[in-house]
Amino acid sequence: KHGVLTPEDPYAKWPGPGPTRAIVPTFLLFDYSFRPAGVSRADAVAWAEASGIRSADEDLLAPDPFATRDDWCAARIEATEARLSALPADVKLIVANHFPLRADLAITPRIPRFSIWCGTTKTNDWHRRFNVEAVIYGHLHLRSSKEIDGVRFEEVSLGYPKQWRQSKPLADYLRPIL
C-alpha cells in the first residue's frame, strides 16, 4: 500500500543486473549478548549503567506480547532463520537490519558499554550460514564499510541532524550497495 517492505512481506527481487538477489528486510532486536564474557545477562544493564549509559529502549521499548525483549528477539531470530533457510541456495541476499549482525561491528568508542543494546550474537555467523552478499544496518550512527569473509557490512546511518555538515549535499552521504 505504501511501497515499504517489512520483514513479513515476501522478499523483493533486486531488479538490477547480475545474479538473482533478494532484498531481505529484518527486524531482529537485541538480547544483551553483545557484552564481555565476564558479564552475565542478569548484570548486563547494571554493567552498562555503571558507566553512565542507559538506552531509552529500557523505558520505551515494550516487549508486548512477549515477556521480555530477549524473548521477542529470540522469536524474531527463529522466524527469520526459517525464512532464510527456505530460500533457494543460489539466491544472493542483501540483508537490511537496524542493528549490526555481528558483535565485532557493535563498537561505539565513546560509549563502549552501549554494545548490549546493539544486536545479538545469534546472528554473528549469518553472513556465512546464508548466501549473504551485503548487510546494511544503521543503529550505531558511525558510518563504516567493512568486508568480513567476503561479505560487505555497511553502516549507512545518516546520524542525527547535529552530526551532518549542512554545507555537504545529501548525495555525499549516500553510497551504492550494488
Write out the residue ranges for each language-model feature.
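A structural motif corresponding to the C-terminal end of an alpha-helix
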Residues: H2-L5, T80-K92, D125-E133
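Active-site-proximal loop/helix segment associated with metal-binding centers of metalloenzymes
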Residues: A22-I94, L101-R110
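Binuclear metal-dependent phosphoesterase catalytic core
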Residues: I107-T108, R113-I116, T120-E133, L140-L178
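Beta-strand-turn-beta hairpins that frame and shape the catalytic cleft
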Residues: V4-P7, Y11-P25, F30, V91-K92, ...
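Low-complexity, flexible helical/coil segments
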Residues: L5-P15, D57-P63, R129-V135, P169-R175
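Catalytic metal-binding/acid-base residues of hydrolase active sites
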Residues: Y11-A12, L28-L29, P100, E133, ...
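Divalent metal-coordination and catalytic microenvironments
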Residues: I23, H98, H139, F153
